[in-house]
Amino acid sequence: MSKIDHILIFNYCMDENDPVLSQQTQVVSRLVDHYSKVTVITGRVGQYQTHSNLTVIDSNWIVGKNFANALRFLYKAIPFLIRGRPQVIFSHMTEVQSFLVSLFSYLLNIKHFLWYAHKAKSFYLQWNHLLLDGIITSTPGSCPIISPKIHAIGQAVDINQFPFRNLSNLKLKKLVHIGRFDKSKNASLIISEVEIARKSFPELFLTLIGAPSNSEEKKYSEAVIINSNNALLDGWLNFSSSVPRSETPKILDGNDIFIHGYQGSLDKTLIEATLVGLPIVTINLEYQAEFGAWGSEDESRNSLSKQIKYLKSLTLERLVSELKTRRDIAVEKHSLEKWIEKLIVVLN
């Protein structure tokens, strides 16, 4: 049990069935074992496991209703901060909520930490960096601020959900990407790079799984699909809508390569695919810093198609050996259990 008795958590949803944010509920369920009292102010309540020391308060956070959201959240949060007096606040991906109460937590001398793992240097992040006790992130390069207040503790992946698969029949034909269909994820780059690789390896097949995060990103996704008409007609490209997170292990197990074009923070899906035993073809520098890249030349590290070519040149024995090594790194640095341990150390 932590030396801190009462923790207040901000998150977007308490719903273990949410296709994107179910992990927020999972984190709460782990933290209740370490604190005498856990209170969560959340944006939406769904299905979650109840505990005698857990209280959940619904602020009814609705996307697009910014002013109303802020008022409802403050109406719930401020009286609780004054009367409930938690000893520490953990804000899980909720930079706006942290911003809204940052001055109050500062004046009330309540320790306040924000989980933030993005490259974007938003106004809210900069404000929170000034008034909060710390910013918690996955890797040093996954937060745009360099400061003693930044704590890198890895990603939080339940390794039991991603067992290492049998690689004896690995064919390196089916490529998959799972993630938001947003411009930052570089779907168009992924498609063009696979098209280049197909000139040497025509058996390659690509599946992109995910949905746009908002109406603006939907325009981008629709344009990508229209521009990919020839690839769709040729039968080597497939688009699929987002799936529940519970289906991710099965999808990863049914493919040969995870391909990824995001140049920012360390995506959790990269860790999940690594745990399963998929080779990761990516230009993400945060991933390469921890796991390396396929190919020794800088040019190869920055080219998805050249990484595919390098992968194809490896013997199965050498490939499997490297994939096992990468899984060991992922378990050591990014398991949910160790993430919780490191988080509690920071919060205390």
Question: Which residues make up each language-model segment?
Answer:
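Donor nucleotide-sugar binding/catalytic pocket of nucleotide-sugar-dependent glycosyltransferases
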Residues: 26, 55-58, 119-122, 129-164
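A charged, aromatic-enriched C-terminal amphipathic alpha-helix characteristic of glycosyltransferases
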Residues: 302-303, 313-348
